Structure formats: structure tokens, C-alpha cells
Amino acid sequence: MLQPNNTKFRKFQKSRVKGVQSNTDQLRYGKFGIKTVSAARIPARTIEAVRRVITRKFKRLGVIWIRVFPDIAVSGKPAEVRMGKGKGAPQYWVCKVKRGAILFEFDGISPQLAKQAARLADSKLPIKTRFVMYS
């Protein structure tokens, strides 16, 4: 799974994901991509699950680029523990994704196969996405 090697801080504050993405809203590497319609936090496990689904659909053909990286640790306390006694330990990693950001790009496959893979990926993701093509 994706996670950073080291970070400046071990624990992060909770914050909201607002706004529209401006610098990663265009396809840069491939002909096809998956673009977000809403903003959310996407866990590293979800990114890995989507990557596996797309790879399986392509049957090892084509190339996949993952344009997001989970760099924010989400902390949590164990079950049945009383409140207080400090913030919990880091549990998993997420990436904040704004509306309009490109999540995945792919190339070297037919448009029909790319569209099917995008539909499968959309079912795994916790946000609404749409399929985009380089024009």
C-alpha cells in the first residue's frame, strides 16, 4: 500500500476538503483518465483496490499512472477506550482530493476497454467520478 517514508509530523489535524483543483485537472501522461466530480478523502487501501481492478481489466496491457498519493495520517483510538489520555496512534493514510482532480490515467488500450475500467473503478471509489479522454 502507498504511504510516505517519513513525514514532518506524525499526527495531522482533521480538516475539510473544499474547492476546485486547478493544477492537476488536465491529463498529463495518458489518453484516458478518471476525474473526480466531488471532493473527499480517499484511503490508501481504496487506491490500491482501484489499481488492482484496472490492472485486472487490462490483462497486463497498457500503462497506468496513479496521480494521487496518500500523505496524511488518520489517527484513531482503539475500541472501548475512554475519552481523553491524548490523541490516538496513526491508523491509516489518506489523500485529500478536490473536485476536478485526475485520480488515474491510462494509455495503450482501446477507448471501450478504458471506459469499462473507469466504470469498475467508480464502483470502488467513495466519490463520484467521470471518464475523461484527451482531445
From Swiss-Prot:
The record's subcellular location field reads: Mitochondrion
Q: Which Gene3D superfamilies match?
A: Ribosomal protein L10e/L16
Under InterPro entries, the record lists:
Ribosomal_uL16 (IPR047873), Ribosomal_uL16_bact-type (IPR000114), Ribosomal_uL16_CS (IPR020798), Ribosomal_uL16_dom (IPR016180), Ribosomal_uL16_sf (IPR036920)
Organism domain of life: Eukaryota
Q: Where is the signal peptide?
A: none
Where is this protein chiefly located? Answer: mitochondrion
Keywords, in A-Z order = Mitochondrion, Ribonucleoprotein, Ribosomal protein
Instruction: Give me the Gene Ontology terms describing cellular component.
Output: mitochondrial large ribosomal subunit
Keyword Oxidoreductase (UniProt): no
GO MF terms listed in the record are:
rRNA binding; structural constituent of ribosome
* Biological process per Gene Ontology, one example term: mitochondrial translation
Q: Does the keyword Ribonucleoprotein apply?
A: yes
What's the short name of a Pfam family annotated to this entry?
Answer: Ribosomal_L16
Q: Which HAMAP family match?
A: Ribosomal_uL16
Which NCBIfam families does the record cross-reference, listed alphabetically? rplP_bact (TIGR01164)
Return the PANTHER family for the record: 50S/60S RIBOSOMAL PROTEIN L16, LARGE RIBOSOMAL SUBUNIT PROTEIN UL16M
- Write out the similarity annotation: Belongs to the universal ribosomal protein uL16 family.
- Write the protein's name: Large ribosomal subunit protein uL16m
What species is this protein from?
Prototheca wickerhamii
